[in-house]
Amino acid sequence: AFAYRDCTPYDGTFLIYKEMFAVLLYRLTRSYWKKQHICLVCEKFSSMAQDNGYYFFKHCMEKNEQSYLNKKILYIIDRKSPDYPKVSPYSKNVVPFMSLRHMCSLLAADLIVSSDSKYHAYATQCRHSIFNRYIKKKKSVFLQHGVTALKRVDSIYGKGNRSACDLFIVTNTMEEKIILDNFGYEPAEVANTGFARWDVLKDCSQDSHNILIMPTWRNWLDSVSDETFEDSTYFRNYMLLLNSGHFNEILEKHDLQIYFYLHAKFQSHLKTFHAASNRIHVLSFDDTPVNEMLMKCRMLITDYSSVCWDMLYQNKPTLFYQFDLDQYNEAHGSYIDMRKDLFGDRAETSAELFDYIEEAAEHDFALKPVYARQRSEYFQFKDQQHSRQICVAIKRRFC
């Protein structure tokens, strides 16, 4: 069988020669690089500054955590990223992706801190890269980009796998137990600190009438044609929802606005989604950062997305629309029983979902007491000092 992927700017012989030159340059200047005690920070494919990596880096720059950790903290990001201006205030500590400085910094790094696996600190999808062998030996901190509970990922991030880490950051006591029971890590390798992005997470929805609909992806629909996608239960259910006359009546009655945000893996199919109502807005991945939408909305409607935890942190409700739970469990798996352990009302049909939306609107989108109790049980702290706690955990583990 053959595996295919899109060609990248880093394919070809030029990169091979550049890597060889970087390795030679590093070896000639090793003493200079090593005394800096470099810690690299990045996000997915080193292409963003929106998630836990960025907020951790921002905190470290503004609170002088470099002195506390005795490390030179550098953020890796592609110059072409739309988020590049966000890191410009810290330009001395920003390293352009795949530059010579990036390559030498990576060779010298003591630690990689990332919201994804450490391999996102480099263009390692180019399998011929000699840098794969160097990255494999690097110590790493996995900040995560979502709470681990609703989808099984131990085959990817479990200890002993390629994307394993040396310190696994978690957000609550339930998640900590999931990691210890299923991923093979020791207690000293797991830190319950909360997410760095939660430092800036606050409820900005007081005067809002917005509901965010944010479904996650399905592995059985990954990279399929538009025709196959449009024939799926996933597409049909969301199109029926977005174009329901009854749904529009509810929106009119309670003066609500809907923002439909498709998962990044399905953005190529975004053009196939549309809604008749001017109260429903279909957003692209680049329109607004997820963090901002979660802060501005009154309620979240999702299926299995871990952003529901960001809503719970803000004391705001989530409705779970799970029309394909059995198929999802078979394909992705879960660490909890979603029929009884969720912290929000669960609907399998659009009729059930509409009833829950009306009920939530009539109660001013207050979190139900039963879910408020779960919130108080899950979170160790909600003090917006999560990046500080991550620094403490890093120092305890590595310094």
Indicate where each model-derived feature is located.
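Catalytic binding pocket for nucleotide-activated donors in carbohydrate/polymer assembly enzymes
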Residues: 187, 273-275, 306-378
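Conserved catalytic-core segment of nucleotide-activated headgroup transferases in glycan assembly
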Residues: 50-57, 191, 196-272, 347-349, ...
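Short acidic-hydrophobic, aromatic-tinged amphipathic segments that line or gate anion-handling sites
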Residues: 93-100, 281-286, 342-356
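Donor nucleotide-activated moiety binding/catalytic core segment of transferases
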Residues: 95-105, 264-309
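Active-site and donor-binding regions of nucleotide-sugar-utilizing enzymes
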Residues: 37-201
